[in-house]
Amino acid sequence: MDNLTKVREYLKSYSRLDQAVGEIDEIEAQRAEKSNYELFQEDGVEEHTRPSYFQAADDSDTESEPEIEDNQGLYVPDPEAEQVEGFIQGPLDDYADEDVDVVFTSDWKQPELESDEHGKTLRLTLPEGLSGEQKSQWLLTIKAVVQSAKHWNLAECTFEASGEGVIIKKRQITPDVYKVTPVMNTHPYQSEAVSDVWSLSKTSMTFQPKKASLQPLTISLDELFSSRGEFISVGGNGRMSHKEAILLGLRYKKLYNQARVKYSL
């Protein structure tokens, strides 16, 4: 702070201060009128049209010119392509693509039904490339198909493929009334008694085996349902035939598929 005060005191006593300020303004005015090129020449700085790093790139390009000339015949430069300074286009690949046989290996196998002393087994191989969510959806679909066998015979169903998936249908078969042999009832009250199929709950029905080594299957509604209420709760009704009620009970007890394979239902 003392030095600044001394400078101020000195400038007050400097008799040629106004003259010095005028000379400085005159010099600055002259420099403003000159071009940048003239200023560079005054300061002794040589002005280059291109920076020094471009000059170094030109020197390296000059050394590799013979090699570039040797490769000029391998490609034709695109005249419309934008030229980038310092970039040298190399030769294009001129070899032809060869046909290569590509073989995709897969471990997927078609469903196989296996038989042994313990029974039969159907193996379904999981499709490859499924995500965790897709795998879960696939397993739920298979499970739904298996559970649907409780309510119908899959062998009697039709299989239709659609754009959204698969449609499985079973056509409702109505009995031919002209082929039904009427049963003559001598007493009207007997007809009323058998109008509800549950009245035959203690009556057994026999199914013949498909192989001579097996015994006939004899079963009644009492063995399949604990009560008429249970029979009604799973879809039964009094107007069913005795055989229809028995088959419903086999499906309810999850015995239908086994019985269908071994016996003539």
Curated annotation (Swiss-Prot):
Residues 245-265 are annotated as: Interaction with the Nucleoprotein-RNA and template-binding. The modification Phosphoserine is found at residues 60, 64, 226-227, 233. GO terms for cellular component: host cell cytoplasm; virion component. It comes from Vesicular stomatitis Indiana virus (strain Mudd-Summers). Residues 1-60 are annotated as: Interaction with N(0). The record marks 138, 141 as: Involved in oligomerization. Gene3D superfamilies: 6.10.140.830, Vesicular stomatitis virus phosphoprotein C-terminal domain. Homodimer. Interacts with the L polymerase; the association of P and L forms the polymerase complex and positions P optimally for encapsidation of newly synthesized genomes with the nucleoprotein. Interacts (via N-terminus) with N(0). Interacts (via C-terminus) with N in ribonucleocapsid (via C-terminus); this interaction allows to package the L polymerase in the virion and positions the polymerase on the template, since P acts as a bridge between N and L. Residues 58-70 have a biased composition (Acidic residues). Residues 42-74 are annotated as: Disordered. Residues 107-177 are annotated as: Oligomerization. Pfam families: Phosphoprotein. GO terms for molecular function: RNA-directed RNA polymerase activity. The N-terminus is disordered and is involved in binding N(0). The region of interaction with the L polymerase is necessary for transcription. The hinge region is highly variable. The central domain is involved in oligomerization. The C-terminus is basic and essential for binding the N-RNA template. Nonenzymatic cofactor regulating the function and conformation of the RNA polymerase and part of the transcription and replication complex. Binds the viral ribonucleocapsid and positions the L polymerase on the template. Acts as a chaperone for newly synthesized free N protein, so-called N(0). Plays a role in virion assembly. Its main location: virion. The keyword Chaperone applies. Belongs to the vesiculovirus protein P family. Keywords: Chaperone, Host cytoplasm, Phosphoprotein, Viral RNA replication, Virion. This is Phosphoprotein. Residues 171-193 are annotated as: Hinge.
